[in-house]
């Protein structure tokens, strides 16, 4: 009888160690420049990043966004990939995030959301 209890306790201990070693890892924290999308706007409509960095877009709203090269100008969409800018064409679902390609050229670049009028972001890339 005692032998069965002792064996059961040993097996239970081994199972506990095995399960503890398979613990759930927390997600990696977001690192790098971040643009937050709140409702139909960028939280900040300008940002400065370093050459070679990418931008992480965090959609904190319940509506999807599309981020592309260009800008809203006088109420009209002006789609344009400026010289030196990475080509950006991202669909970002509600409460999700996406990352652009890196900005490898210094300069000022425009990005916008074509489904939300007036939603523009100006990115300044420095050396």
Feature names for model-found ranges:
Residues 2, 21-127:
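Extracytoplasmic copper-binding redox domains, predominantly the cupredoxin/blue-copper superfamily
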């Amino acid at each position: 009888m005692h032998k069965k209890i002792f064996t059961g306790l040993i097996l239970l201990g081994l199972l506990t160690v095995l399960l503890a070693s398979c613990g759930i890892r927390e997600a990696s924290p977001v690192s790098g420049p971040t643009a937050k999308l709140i409702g139909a706007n960028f939280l900040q409509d300008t940002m400065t990043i370093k050459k070679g960095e990418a931008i992480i877009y965090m959609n904190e709203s319940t509506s999807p966004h599309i981020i592309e090269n260009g800008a809203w100008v006088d109420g009209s969409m002006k789609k344009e990939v400026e010289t030196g800018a990475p080509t950006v064409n991202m669909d970002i679902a509600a409460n999700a995030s996406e990352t652009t390609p890196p900005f490898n050229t210094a300069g000022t670049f425009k990005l916008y959301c074509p489904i939300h009028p007036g939603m523009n972001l100006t990115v300044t890339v420095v050396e």
